[in-house]
Amino acid sequence: MMARYIAGSKYPILLTAALLAAPAFAGELGASSCTSLNLCPCSDVATTSVSVQQSSMQSMSQNAGQMTMSMPNMKMTAPTTFIEEILAHSAAGTAAEPNSTPHDMLMAQRGAWTFMFHGVGFLNSQQQTGPRGGDKVFGTSWFMPMAQRDLGNGTLTVRGMFSLDPATITGRQYPELFQVGETAFGKPIVDGQHPHNFFMELAAIYDWKLAKDTLLSFYAAPVGDPAIGPEAFPHRVSASEDTLAPLGHHLQDSTHIADDVVTLGLAYKIARIEVSGFHGREPNEHRWEIQAGAIDSWSARFTLNPTKDWSGQYSITHLTSPEQLFPSEDTLRMTASVTYNKPLRDGAWGNWATTLVWGRNRNSPDAEIFNSYLAESTARFANHNYAWTRIENVDRTNELLLGENPIPPGFQERFVARIQAYTFGYDHEWNFIRHISTAFGGQYTLYTAPPSLDPIYGSHPMGVLTFLRFRAIPSEK
């Protein structure tokens, strides 16, 4: 079935072609597997993990928490403080991660500028059981180029993030049982997940060093990620091999692609507080466009990185008219999360990342409250093996009962059920192509729901996803 689909469609091949083009890019940039990145006066083309400690650079020893390689007058180490982690900007938007979080990046130095690139793509085959289950071959991807330089008493970062999802996910959705929260072509998407926008982020960030331990940050993006929630699921290391959106996505981190975003952040030692203004309406089915609008929504987030392996956040946001089908309805969202990351044997053997997330939406004016809980964990062991799990407990609304039907007149969202999802997966990667990791794997998801939903979903709904995964990697990995 997969071979027949690929032969008859150009779209999944676009995803593969884009990832295979990365070696040419890597030939220009060099590569780095790093914990975090920032400006450095490195050679014209360098394979490195960069730290803000430019003045003391001598040599570099590679492991998941620290990279080393002999280079003239340079020592490049991983961030040792939260301020350095912020300056790295290896996460989407202004989200924070534990300092020890590893990232694969391609890098180059051109004059005062440091250029970076990282990205990943999946070619997926999804099969699900039950009356509502669907089968589909589709691609998911994101690519992030970034550039940094010193400017005045601070650092300027410009960044783009793009996805081929609008081309590789036909019909503006892929099947995912019990997923709700989006619309396309005037109808709700039920038991399916929408593609990401082609423009996921176009942002400029200026970090002004007020003192050794104090940083004032300005973030502006016609499309970007406001200060809401944890690191969005496509970019979390704890979800690096699970390409499907969590069922709680629209109660936790769905605003990671928002329009007209401005954020102000102040960090001191291990803590940071941020406030954002942005346009609250979620994107519609026109996924190739930037859908600008007035800044009508706000958020605030407090982040704490007490040690190099831990990061936590709490955020609150008011979303003005986020849903196209419910234009008179606003949402108050609260989230809290904790992420733990641990390099295994100092990174020589692998890495283990775990995230816990709680998200809550309260819709107004009816004051309905919906909660979601997530625990996910991914372990990379023996360097080329990945095992992961995601466990969720989420509230679902009566949108589930609509199926593919339009919203009827006078419809009001109400709680209908609490759903549990249990996912377990494994993949193994090979480095057939320079600077490209290729992995083949799969995952199994079992859902539990109240017996009242058995006539719609069957008694034991489940899904199986198999995939090929491509990721830009350093040549030495």
What are these regions (language model features)?
Residues 108, 147-151, 208, 265-268, ...:
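Residue-level signature of outer-membrane beta-barrel architecture
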Residues 169-303:
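Surface-exposed coil loops of outer-membrane beta-barrel proteins
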Residues 316-326, 353-367, 372-376, 384-433, ...:
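Outer membrane beta-barrel transmembrane domains
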